[in-house]
Amino acid sequence: MTKMTNRAKQAEATKNKIYECGVKLIRKHGFDQVTVEQISKEAGVSVGTYYYYYQSKFDLFSEIFKRADEYFLNHVASNLSAKTFHEQVVEFFDKYADFNISDGIEMVKKLYTSDNKMFITKGRAMQKILQTIVEAGQSNYEITGYLSSQDITNMLFVTARGVIYEWCLYDGNLDLKEEMKKTITIMVKGLS
C-alpha cells in the first residue's frame, strides 16, 4: 500500500472540505438554491479550486450518492448477519433507514424530489448488493424466479423510497425504522 504524500493528504482534505460545506448548504437551502460561489466561499476556497475537484455542482451532488454507495460497500454488504433472504432484505433496508436518519430529515427532504434522477441510475453499488441478495434467494428457492433479480431489486427500492418519502411528508415524525421493517417484511413475504 502506497503512503500518501502531504500534498495528496492536503488535496483530499480540501475536496472533503468542499464536500462538507456543499452538503451543509444543500441541507439548509436545497440543491437548486445553492451556487458554486456560495459553496466555495463557505469552504474558504476559490471557485477555480472548486472546479479543480468537481466539474459542476451536479458532480458534488453525485458525490453524495457515491459516498452512500461506498458506505454500503464497505460497512453493510459484508456485515449483514441475517441468514435467510427475507431476513437479509429486512436487515439491508434497516441499514438504509439508518443511513437516511443519519443524513437528517432536512437533507433527505432536499434529496427526495422527482428531479433527482440519481435514485434511478442503474448499476449503483447499493443496487448491486441488494441484487446479489435477491439472486441468492432465487438460487435457494426462497423467492420467486418468475421475476428477474433486477426487477425485484428495483421494486424493493421503489418501496423503500416510498417509505422514506412518507417519513419526509411527516417531517421525520414517524418511526422510519419501524415503518421500513413493517413495509419491507410485507413486500418480501409477497415474493415467496
Label every model-predicted segment.
Residues 70-73, 115-142, 150-154, 158:
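Amphipathic alpha-helical packing segments from all-alpha helical-bundle domains
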Residues 32, 143-144:
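Conserved hydrophobic residue
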Residues 63, 74-102, 153-156, 177:
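Hydrophobic alpha-helical connector segments
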Residues 1-13:
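N-terminal intrinsically disordered/low-complexity leader segments
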Residues 94-117:
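Amphipathic alpha-helical segments used for helix-helix packing
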Residues 13, 17, 25-59, 63:
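Helix-turn-helix
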Residues 11, 15, 61, 65, ...:
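Amphipathic, non-transmembrane alpha-helical scaffold segments
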Residues 1-2, 82, 98, 132-140, ...:
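C-terminal peripheral helix-coil segments that are non-catalytic and often amphipathic
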